[in-house]
Amino acid sequence: LATLAATAQPAKQEAFQPLPGGFLHVPMNDLNALHQAVYNNLADVCAVMIEPVQGEAGVYPWDPDTLYDVAQFCRKNGLLLIVDEVQSGIFRCGEFPFAFQNLGITPDIITMAKGIASGFPMGACAARIEVAEAFEPGDHGSTFGGSNLAMAAAHATLVTLSRGHYDDRVTEVGDYFTEKLAQVEGVTEVRGMGLMLGADLEEGIDAHKVVAQGLEEGFLLNATGSNTLRFLPPLIVTETEIDKLIDALPGMIAAVRE
């Protein structure tokens, strides 16, 4: 429930009210708004939590200079910097295991899930030693935590990734995918990092209808808004597989264009 409270999307929260309080939301890349929110509530603020690449919002990477300033602001004011890498972590964004490493900051706490066990239910939280010492046994637990199967899936995933040179591969294929998406008729903007990409569609093209059309044609797509497609392919995706989607995407868009 605290995780739901942290999101800035009311639609995700409505079915689970009442939620824990204590979260303030400010616009991404707006340092002045962050300053104001913190200084107006300084006695009650303990941390700043960010996604290096916002996923549900439409795949928006942070501006590196602004994020660096956020990290410095946290250090100056004694605030913990928490980075949510649930979507963007585990080599999803290319060169490094975590997206924040592409952006020149060092967080105090990292949350991760999804890719850590190749989609098997698994989550983890990492922290600097000084921060982790605040945890006592039982403070952060789960009824189903520590599943042997989940641990085995995560171990196999991390061993495979550490041996597979996915850092260079994801960056290379991600650049290829970005370039190809930008050439598709009906796409107005492509953004993201590595193999975490978002593509905005022209006005009048419903992204959710494109997703439905894609499913009929054998493509599993995702929409994060009325006109934004999100692409999170497997890290082993090939240029040939990307080409198949790129060849089919104009037809999907044309089929639903109003």
Can you say where each PLM-predicted feature lies in the sequence?
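Conserved N-terminal phosphate-binding loop of PLP-dependent enzymes in the Aspartate aminotransferase
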Residues: 1-258
